[in-house]
Amino acid sequence: MAVDEWLLETVVEPVLRVYRWSGEWGSLGCFGDFKQAEREIANVCWVRRYTGGGVVDHQNDWTYTFVIPSSEDVARSKGAESYRVIHQGLLLALNESLNPVLSDGSAAGGDSMCFRNPVCYDVVDSVGNKLAGAGQRRSKEGLLHQGSVAGSCDEIVSIDRSERLAAALAKEWGLEDLLPPPEVIASKVAARYGLDDWTRRR
């Protein structure tokens, strides 16, 4: 989470970050109810995201972040439109056997669990089961999109999915090692993401 916040603060070109969780983790949105999250998923470590959205169980998902500078049209578009554009790209990255489509939002019911509440432009299968969702946050620097796809995958599938998503979202792209300044990340963890008070604040 600290790396994602740093990416939003320093973004000058679009960045797609794909990562795995070490251990058993759940996350909740910036405005989520911590006690409700604990009732939904037991015996996990928790972190509060910098974005909105519901409760996500990261024990069995594929997690990515897409950060877009404010110089890009999609970063300045309304929330629903940026969500649609990014998830349209995600459709192309997912296995076609899943028959993924974008949700029209008609099944949204206000459930706190992300994958039980398909909102408009979430990725769902042919019968409406949610396959992918995300939370977003905007700043003067750009747009932070933190996404989760249901179901874990091995490294080969993850790399292929990452490359397909990058190709769907960009005319040109390349791979680079992401090396955030350790002291900056440590300070963000100490000030926010590593604090029990931050995680449990609502």
What function would you assign to each model-found segment?
Residues 95, 99-156:
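A contiguous pocket-lining binding segment that forms or flanks enzyme active sites
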Residues 38, 73-79, 155-161:
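Short, conserved charged micro-motifs
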Residues 63-110:
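Contiguous, small/hydrophobic- and glycine-enriched helical/loop subdomains that border
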Residues 1-41, 48-49, 55, 170-202:
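Active-site loop/lid in soluble adenylation, ligation, and acyl-transfer enzymes
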Residues 50-73, 145:
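Residues forming anionic-ligand binding surfaces in small-molecule and nucleic-acid pockets
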Residues 124-125, 137-202:
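C-terminal accessory segment of soluble enzyme catalytic cores
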Residues 6, 89-97, 164-172:
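Generic non-transmembrane alpha-helical segments
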